[in-house]
Amino acid sequence: AGWRLEIKKYPLLTEFAAWRTDANWKKWWNGGRKYLRFDEPGASGGYYTQDDMKEIIAYAQQHYITIIPEIEMPAHSEEVLAAYPQLSCSGEPYKNADFCVGNEETFTFLENVLTEVMELFPSEYIHVGGDEAGKAAWKTCPKCQARIKALGIKGDKKHSAEAYLQSFIITHAEKFLNDKGRQIIGWDEILEGGLAPNSTVMSWRGESGGIEAAKQHHDVIMSPN
């Protein structure tokens, strides 16, 4: 837990969201899951500067290794929302784990972060996460519900409208990255709602997600739990 890569456009990610209140993860997880500024007493954490990462990438390339970065969306974003709470549905820190998909600033943030990531990482692939989105806040968020209405999204027997809203943010990131010559990898939840054929699915919830992705002619990485 915590943000681990310097993003120059968003300094609070490493001044604040990279530092937990406890070095022991279990104690931190069960003790409120709060973050501190790097210069506050008790702050525990750290991050890679962009210069650090350039050095690591160069070393990896010398050893024929490609480093693929992961920028998680729309869930597992508590640390981002602690630093930039306006990107959450509530507008408050420590209330939500998912980005507000009805907020245009969310997409600006993600595109800016991905741009800096692409400037650092030569990998053809960028992992966009996509797993374990709770979506509960989206059901009562006026902005998310307005987005659902504007897109004409309807729930059906397979998935809720909010599940298809997750597909919207993933396909938005996919198009943004494809336009820059990159391809996405995502956890198997990204299958819900449809994907472009060049997307790679990483199956972690057993083997069924990978099988379904292969049936849809996607490349698959099997990593079942």
Language model features: what each stretch is:
Residues 69-73, 130-132, 188, 203-205, ...:
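A cross-domain feature marking catalytic cores of carbohydrate-active enzymes
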Residues 126, 178-188, 220-224:
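Acidic/polar loop patches that form or flank catalytic/metal-binding clefts of enzymes
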Residues 142-147, 187-198:
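Active-site clefts of carbohydrate-active enzymes
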Residues 127, 179, 195-202:
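Catalytic cores of carbohydrate-active enzymes
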Residues 1-182:
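Substrate-binding cleft of carbohydrate-active enzyme catalytic domains
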Residues 191-197, 204-225:
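Conserved alpha/beta catalytic core and glycan-binding cleft of carbohydrate-active enzymes
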